[in-house]
Design a protein with these regions (language model features):
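N-terminal Rossmann NAD(P)H-binding glycine-rich loop of SDR-like oxidoreductase domains
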Residues: 9-27
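Conserved Rossmann-fold cofactor-binding substructure of NAD(P)-dependent oxidoreductases
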Residues: 64-80, 86-89
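Structural motif
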Residues: 8, 81-82, 107
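Rossmann-fold cofactor-recognition segment
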Residues: 53-69
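C-terminal catalytic/substrate-binding lobe primarily of soluble NAD(P)-dependent oxidoreductases
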Residues: 2, 156-431, 437-438, 442-451
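Glycine-/Pro-rich loop/turn segments that contact NAD(P) or position catalytic residues
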Residues: 89-207, 255
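Conserved glycine-rich Rossmann-like NAD(P)H-binding loop of the short-chain dehydrogenase/reductase
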Residues: 31-45
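A short, Lys/Arg-enriched amphipathic alpha-helix followed by its capping loop at the start of a domain
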Residues: 25-33, 260
C-alpha cells in the first residue's frame, strides 16, 4: 500500500518551530519532482509558512488536519506516501496519527524522544503497520539517528572484516553546542509527570529493554543502567559523565538489535556517556556537569523551579535563534570491541545546532529516504527504528549533505583469531593496553542558552 498517493511527503506541524525548519530544508534540498505538502490545523498559518519558503514551495498543497480529529488524520494519511511530524509532546497527542498511518500503509517518521510513547506505539500499532506495509519510524532526529546508525555501521564493518559480534559498545559525546526549545522542555515534563504518577510506567522507563519486541527473549547481561554520575573510565582512559539522551538512545539501539534478530550479538552491551577528556580539569568538569544534570532533573520535578524554567525558556513552538542554530555542532565517537578481539571506532559529526538545524536535516532526509529509496530499504514493516527501517540508505543521504558517519578498525585481529560467541565473556580490564588515536581528548562544550 502507499504507492498510489497524491503526495510523496507531507510535513505535519509545519507552522511550529521544528516543522518550519523541516519544511525549509525540503524546499531547499528536495528534488524538484518530489510532491510535498504542508499540514496543520490552520490553513491561514500554513499559507504564511509556504509564502516564506520561496518559489520551490509555491505549488505545495496545504492540508488541514487536527490530532483531535481522527477523520482528518485518516484523510491526511491516505493522501501521502510518507508523513513526517514534528508535533509534540507525542505521548500526549501523537498516537492517533501513528494509528492512521499504520492502518493506511503510510510511512511515518517523527522526532519523539519519549520512551512511553514509543512503547504504546509498538503495543497498539505494530500489527496494523506490519499488515499494511507501513514503516513507523520514531526518533528520527538527534535522538536517535546518530546513535542508531552509528552502531549499525560498526556492526556492518565488523561483519565485513570477519570480526564477529559486537560486545561492549560505548557512545561518547565529545563536543556539542546547541539550544533548547520549549517543545523539548514540554516533552520532558510530560514524561516526568507520567512516571511520577505510575509505578508501572516508572519501571518501564527504567527498563533498559523497554522497547524490545520480545522482553523475555533479551539476554541477562547484568547491570545496564544508564550512567548517573561522574566516573573515570579505565577503558576509554577519560573522565565521563551522564548523557542527557542516553535514556532514549540506548533503548532505541537495543530495539534495533532485537528487531534484526540480535544481529549485533546476544552479548551486545551498549551505553552512552559524555566525555570530558583526561586533563587536569576533566574530573571537575565531569562532576560539575553531573551535578548540573541532577539539578535540572530535580528542577523539572519541583513546582516552583519548574514554573521558573517555563518563564526562562522558550514556549512550545519556539526555539534557538538563527545564530545558535548556525554555529552549533556535535561530535560523537562510538567505541566497540568484538567477539574476535578487534576494536572499531565510529565517528558521527555534523555542523548546526543538534536539536534543530541538524535534526531538521535528519528528519527531512528521512522523509525523502522513505519516499524515494524504497528499493534500497530493508524489507521490513511495523514499528521500526532508523537503523531497521532505512539503515545504510539514510547514512548515504546524510553523508551527501555534509554529515560525517565513518568507521574504522583501530586494532588488527590477532592471528588465528576466532569469534568467541560460545565462550563466556571476560570482565573488562581496569587498565587495558592503550590504543593510539582512538579516544577523544577534547572537552565537551555544552551551551543550552535559550536564544
Amino acid at each position: 500500500m502507499g504507492g498510489d498517493r497524491e503526495l510523496d511527503v507531507v510535513v505535519f506541524g509545519a507552522t511550529g518551530f521544528a516543522g518550519r525548519l523541516v519544511a525549509s530544508y525540503l524546499a531547499a534540498h528536495a528534488p524538484g519532482d518530489v510532491r510535498i505538502g504542508l499540514a496543520g490545523r490552520s490553513e491561514r498559518r500554513l499559507a504564511e509558512v509556504r509564502a516564506r519558503l520561496g518559489a520551490a514551495a509555491t505549488a505545495w498543497p496545504l492540508l488541514v488536519a487536527d490530532l483531535a480529529d481522527p477523520v482528518s488524520l485518516g484523510a491526511l494519511a491516505r493522501a501521502a506516501r510518507v508523513v513526517v511530524t514534528t508535533v509534540g509532546p507525542y505521548r500526549a497527542r501523537g498516537l492517533a496519527l501513528v494509528q492512521a498511518c499504520a492502518e493506511a500503509g503510510t510511512d511515518y517518521a517523527d522526532l519523539t524522544g519519549e520512551v512511553l510513547f514509543i512503547r504504546d506505539s509498538i503495543d497498539r500499532c505494530q500489527d496494523a503497520a506490519a499488515s499494511s506495509g507501513a514503516r513507523i519510524v520514531h526518533c528520527c532526529g538527534f535522538d536517535s539517528v546518530p546513535s542508531d546508525l552509528g552502531v549499525l555501521l560498526l556492526h556492518q564493518a565488523a561483519r565485513a572484516g570477519g570480526a564477529g559480534d559486537l560486545l561492549d559498545t560505548t557512545l561518547v559525546v565529545t563536543a556539542m553546542r546547541g539550544g533548547l526549545s520549549g517543545g523539548t522542555l514540554a516533552s520532558m515534563m510530560g514524561q516526568l509527570d507520567e512516571v511520577r504518577a505510575s509505578a508501572e510506567r516508572r519501571r518501564l522507563v527504567q527498563d533498559p529493554y523497554a522497547l524490545s519486541p520480545d522482553r523475555a527473549a533479551e539476554p541477562g547481561l547484568g547491570d545496564e543502567r544508564d550512567l548517573d554520575r561522574a566516573r573515570y573510565d579505565g577503558e576509554l582512559r577519560m573522565w565521563t559523565g551522564p548523557w542527557l539522551m542516553a535514556g532514549i538512545n540506548t533503548r532505541v539501539v537495543r530495539r534495533s538489535n532485537a528487531v534484526q534478530g540480535w544481529a549485533y550479538g546476544r552479548r551486545f552491551r551498549y551505553r552512552e556517556v559524555t566525555g570530558f577528556g583526561a586533563g587536569p580539569a576533566a574530573p571537575v568538569l565531569a562532576v560539575t556537569a553531573s551535578a548540573g544534570t541532577k539539578a535540572a532533573e530535580a528542577g523539572l520535578a519541583f513546582g516552583p523551579s519548574r514554573e521558573l524554567l517555563r518563564r526562562l525558556l522558550p514556549a512550545p513552538g519556539h526555539g534557538p535563534g538563527e545564530k545558535t542554530r548556525r554555529t552549533g555542532f556535535f561530535r560523537i565517537q562510538i567505541h566497540t570491541r568484538t567477539s574476535a578481539g578487534a576494536r572499531y571506532l565510529g565517528t558521527i559529526e555534523a555542523q548546526g545546532d543538534p536539536g534543530y538545524a541538524a535534526t531538521s536535516v535528519m528528519l527531512g532526509e528521512t522523509g525523502l529516504c522513505l519516499a524515494l529509496d524504497k528499493d534500497q530499504l530493508p524489507d521490513r514493516a511495523g514499528v521500526l527504528t532508523p537503523a531497521t527501517a532505512m539503515g545504510a540508505a539514510l547514512a548515504t543521504r546524510l553523508r551527501s549533505v555534509g554529515h560525517t558517519l565513518a568507521t574504522r578498525q583501530i586494532t588488527q585481529l590477532p592471528a588465528n583469531s576466532r569469534p568467541l560467541a560460545d565462550q563466556p565473556q571476560r570482565p573488562r580490564a581496569a587498565h587495558p593496553p592503550q590504543v593510539p588515536d582512538c579516544h577523544p581528548t577534547g572537552l565537551t562544550v555544552m551551551d543550552f542558552r535559550p536564544t
